[in-house]
Amino acid sequence: SAGKYRLTGLLRGRRGTEQHIGTHTAGERFVLLTLAGTIRPNAGAAEIGVERNYKAVSVGTSLSQASARTFTNTGSGLKPLSPVHLSGGRQPNNDWIIGWTRRGRIDTAWRDSVDVPVGETTESYEVDIMSGTTVKRTITSVTPEITYTSAQQVTDFGANQTTITVNVYQKSATVGRGFAAARAY
């Protein structure tokens, strides 16, 4: 019927939005955007925490008819994307080696099996070793791999662990931690 649309074939979780995949419901309002006529606000680090009102105006609608939505810039567009392809395992000496592949939010073109360029000032990561929702240890790294040693496990848990859960973050000099990649081993 008039004014109703059925959306199908949508690609979700693109360009670092996977954390929002499950946040929409049937019957929810949406704005259909096309590249032509779309203006993206240029909000840099100085705009983080600033609240502004925005209106979405379509063909046949005037600015005065559109409802304003308040938005506070959280800097999420500046956060590094979550790493992907987390891998690893427990070694014979009880150390855990965990590795991953970084993603880029800037200059993301695939170049014949070569990693995307680091889109941050420096390549830096933090890996949280978890116990439920409690962070037991944070390990920093400047490469996409860490070793969680047997000695660290004994300090953190009182014994070597047969399973672990990690949250991996790439870091930004501007906004700190990016989005987490979580995995249980």
Language model: regions and residue ranges:
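Interface-prone segments of viral and bacterial extracellular assemblies
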Residues: 1-185
